[in-house]
């Protein structure tokens, strides 16, 4: 189906999902979550040290700092994500209303996380700002076609939610945990919108959606690839168990692609769609094996540490 045809076919679904979202989401204010009482002036020219951090008596390592930096910079890249999603869905009707509402909600995330990081001095503010300038100046974001966009957005929002929540759990600081929990709750509602939208698209155009699903599962990458030194940060994040291969398979691919979308049970596929389904099932089986090996190696390393 052409993009205009599937968007028209899915408009009632988008309207229903938008109404569900608006009736479920709760108003909140970033300033309510920022511990301003811990804040003090940042003197220009001073060099940040981990000892400067005030995390309510808790300490964090470089893995959690990398996660905080990547999580915030991902949210800071919102202008480009807005551009991408608006290009996919358009400006009119429920589609445009959703894009603008999603953007407004996402905007609060960077405000809350940034406020927490600046008042607590959890990470180096100079490194953070230089990384933000580099990333946003580059404007690097995924730019999938419509059918793949349905898949990517659902997987990406869930991955972001998991990353935020796991980061908060490792902070130790109850205030920081609440910040990341609040942001993660928004991301969960967003992924529900995209997940169910993708499910409806599969019913309408199963063949093209199966091809899109296989491609996105094969090539999926967390947002943030434009962040300076992203590979090093991603390795630290995986080492801490915030987001790794096991989590990606067990908490994203298996529950969404297999259980929610029932990728292995979709019927009525043509040659290309059936071939994509076969490749997808093989890839998911490989992903499961890799996830198990990753977990075994990590557990062995922890046992000998």
Question: Which residues does each PLM region occupy?
Answer:
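Non-heme di-metal
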Residues: 1-305
